[in-house]
Amino acid sequence: MIRTDWTMAEAWAIHALPFADLMHRAQTLHRAHFDPNAIETASLLSIKTGGCPEDCGYCSQSAHHDTGVKATKLMGTEEVLAAARRAKASGAQRFCMGAAWRSPKDRDMDKLCDMVRGVAELGLETCMTLGMLSPEQVARLKAAGLDFYNHNIDTSPEYYAQIASTRTMENRLDTVEQVRKGGIKVCCGGILGMGEAEEDRIAMLVTLATLPAHPDSVPVNLWNEIEGVPVQARAQAVDPFALVRIVALARILMPASVVRLSAGRTGMSDELQALCFLAGANSIFVGDQLLTTGNPAAWKDQDLLSRLGMHIAPAQARPRVAAE
């Protein structure tokens, strides 16, 4: 049963279960909704890097922080499509395009829509993350064929003011709702390791699990150490078992959502990734680069999945159970 009325008390109780019991509950729900041996793959491209006016304290692309990231202009459509072809050849099923903006300018919408149409014509699912959107922009992207829109809430409502001041949690949730109402699938998750308390991680998932509809995809990111950003001063490494518990809780609270291991996999052992898959994670980014951070080499992912007896879900098919 899909619920959107979870409470913090319920989530805390689940999170605190003995590890074996938590894993059993998560894996049971995972098998009810997905093929447990199938992994969804996506590739991520920064189509406009740096110079972002937002002050998100974790981000290397903010114009407020001296991180060495140079601002670029929006890529040309053909350059983006060439990258999409390479992503498809490397095994990606979805192509995500990210731009470091507060929100896209109307003058860029024609080019963005051309990118969406071009990537879709290659047989890839399309995803964008461009910041906040107006209802009119949502409608244009939907008409162009955009499948997914990523807009993370990053952390709990209570901790959010500690990491950003130029936009609020309400701004983020409003964008998520605009996207959902506009008929585009929602990709929305958060980041661990920014100095937040365990309670904040749980509250972040409860926030997502009590939306009118659960996100279609829930990315779980580990913060990558970045010189020159405010979060660096209070960032703390995430205990491996704490990560697995959050993945399991995400699977239990949102059983039909794809849970993606996103940024931070370069610092995860094969064993930790395997535990995350067992806990319900069923999507990864492929390719050597995310937006501005590294990602495991393709051969490492292929080797890991092979050793685990897992496989990439067929193109254009989410890793659902056969009955669905």
Swiss-Prot record:
Pfam families: BATS (PF06968), Radical_SAM (PF04055). GO terms for biological process: biotin biosynthetic process. Keywords: 2Fe-2S, 4Fe-4S, Biotin biosynthesis, Iron, Iron-sulfur, Metal-binding, S-adenosyl-L-methionine, Transferase. InterPro entries: Aldolase_TIM (IPR013785), BATS_dom (IPR010722), Biotin_synth/BioAB (IPR002684), Biotin_synthase (IPR024177), Elp3/MiaA/NifB-like_rSAM (IPR006638), rSAM (IPR007197). Pathway: Cofactor biosynthesis; biotin biosynthesis; biotin from 7,8-diaminononanoate: step 2/2. [4Fe-4S] cluster binds at residues 52, 56, 59. Its cofactor is [4Fe-4S] cluster; [2Fe-2S] cluster. CDD domains: Radical_SAM. It catalyses: (4R,5S)-dethiobiotin + (sulfur carrier)-SH + 2 reduced [2Fe-2S]-[ferredoxin] + 2 S-adenosyl-L-methionine = (sulfur carrier)-H + biotin + 2 5'-deoxyadenosine + 2 L-methionine + 2 oxidized [2Fe-2S]-[ferredoxin]. [2Fe-2S] cluster binds at residues 96, 127, 187, 260. Its EC number is 2.8.1.6. GO terms for molecular function: 2 iron, 2 sulfur cluster binding; 4 iron, 4 sulfur cluster binding; biotin synthase activity; iron ion binding. Residues 37-256 form the Radical SAM core domain. Binds 1 [4Fe-4S] cluster. The cluster is coordinated with 3 cysteines and an exchangeable S-adenosyl-L-methionine. Homodimer. Belongs to the radical SAM superfamily. Biotin synthase family. Catalyzes the conversion of dethiobiotin (DTB) to biotin by the insertion of a sulfur atom into dethiobiotin via a radical-based mechanism. NCBIfam families: bioB (TIGR00433). PANTHER family: BIOTIN SYNTHASE (PTHR22976), BIOTIN SYNTHASE, MITOCHONDRIAL (PTHR22976:SF2). This is Biotin synthase 1. The gene is bioB1.
